[in-house]
C-alpha cells in the first residue's frame, strides 16, 4: 500500500441542502435501469455477496448494487446521473431498503463506490460521476472497473480531491474503508484480505468445506486401514 494520508470521511450532514427545503417522502423507490449485460450483473452480484458473506456477523453496514441514491429534492432533473453500480455505507443499520435516501439516513453518503464501466457509461463514470462523488457525496473511496478491457482504477478523497490509489505488487488496490484489497481474478473484480487471500463467495466457501471434509474422510480411512494392518481395531481407539 502506498498511502500518505487517510481518505476523508464521507459527508454526514445536510449542510449543503437548505433548511427551508421541504423534503419529499422518504418512501422512494429505486429508479435505476436494468444492468447493461449479464457480465455486469455477475460482477455486481459478486461484489455484494462476497462482502455480505465475509461480514455475515456484522449488522453495521449496507452493501447494495444498482440502487438509486436520493440526496436532493431537485435530483430527478439530473437524468444523466444514475445511482452507483455498487456502494457500501458503514455505520448504518443492515436492512432491506427500496432506495438510499440521504436525509432519512442521518445524512450518510456511501463510504465506497464501484462503477462497472461500459461503452455507454464510461465517460459519465470517469467524469460526471467522479465529480459528483468527490464534490457532493464526498465519498472517501471511488473505484471503477471495465469487465471487458479490465481497466481498473481507484481514488482516495484527500483534501477534497480524488487522488489515484497506487497498486501493490499484485496490481491490487487497497480499500481502507473495507480493510480489503480489490483485484482482478479471471476477469472479475474480487476482494482480498490484507494478507492476500481471496475472499470467497458463499458457494466457494461451501465447496471448500466439502473438499476439506472429503480429504479428512480419505485420511481417516487410510489411517484406519493402517491400524488394521497392525491388528488394531480403529473403532476401539
Regions found by a protein language model. Give the residues of each.
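A generic secondary-structure signal marking the coil-to-beta-strand transition
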Residues: 43, 59-61, 84-85, 110
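Short acidic/polar active-site loop segments enriched in Thr and Asp
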Residues: 140
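C-terminal interaction segment
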Residues: 2-32, 36, 53, 71-84, ...
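A structural signal for short, well-ordered beta-strand segments and their strand-loop junctions
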Residues: 62-64, 143-146
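A short acidic/basic microdomain associated with nuclease active sites
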Residues: 57-72
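A structured, charge-rich N-terminal accessory region that forms the first stable segment of a protein
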Residues: 41-54
Amino acid at each position: 500500500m502506498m498511502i500518505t494520508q487517510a481518505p476523508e470521511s464521507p459527508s454526514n450532514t445536510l449542510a449543503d441542502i437548505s433548511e427551508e427545503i421541504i423534503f419529499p417522502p422518504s418512501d422512494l423507490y429505486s429508479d435505476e435501469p436494468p444492468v447493461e449485460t449479464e457480465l455486469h450483473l455477475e460482477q455486481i452480484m459478486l461484489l455484494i455477496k462476497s462482502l455480505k458473506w465475509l461480514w455475515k456477523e456484522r449488522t453495521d453496514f449496507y452493501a447494495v448494487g444498482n440502487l438509486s441514491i436520493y440526496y436532493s429534492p431537485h435530483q430527478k432533473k439530473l437524468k444523466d446521473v444514475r445511482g452507483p453500480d455498487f456502494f457500501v455505507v458503514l455505520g448504518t443499520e443492515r436492512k432491506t431498503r427500496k432506495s438510499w435516501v440521504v436525509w432519512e439516513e442521518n445524512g450518510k453518503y456511501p463510504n465506497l463506490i464501484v462503477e462497472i464501466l461500459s461503452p455507454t457509461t464510461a465517460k459519465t463514470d470517469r467524469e460526471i460521476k467522479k465529480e459528483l462523488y468527490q464534490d457532493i457525496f464526498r465519498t472517501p473511496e471511488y473505484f471503477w472497473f471495465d469487465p471487458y478491457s479490465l481497466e481498473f482504477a481507484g481514488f482516495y478523497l484527500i483534501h477534497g480531491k480524488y487522488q489515484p490509489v497506487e497498486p501493490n505488487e499484485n496490481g491490487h488496490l487497497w480499500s481502507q474503508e473495507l480493510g480489503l484489497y480489490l483485484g482482478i481474478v479471471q476477469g472479475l473484480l474480487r476482494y482480498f484480505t490484507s494478507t492476500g487471500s481471496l475472499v470467497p463467495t458463499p458457494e466457494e466457501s461451501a465447496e471448500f468445506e466439502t473438499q476439506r471434509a472429503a480429504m479428512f474422510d480419505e485420511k481417516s480411512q487410510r489411517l484406519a486401514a493402517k491400524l488394521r494392518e497392525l491388528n488394531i481395531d480403529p473403532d476401539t481407539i
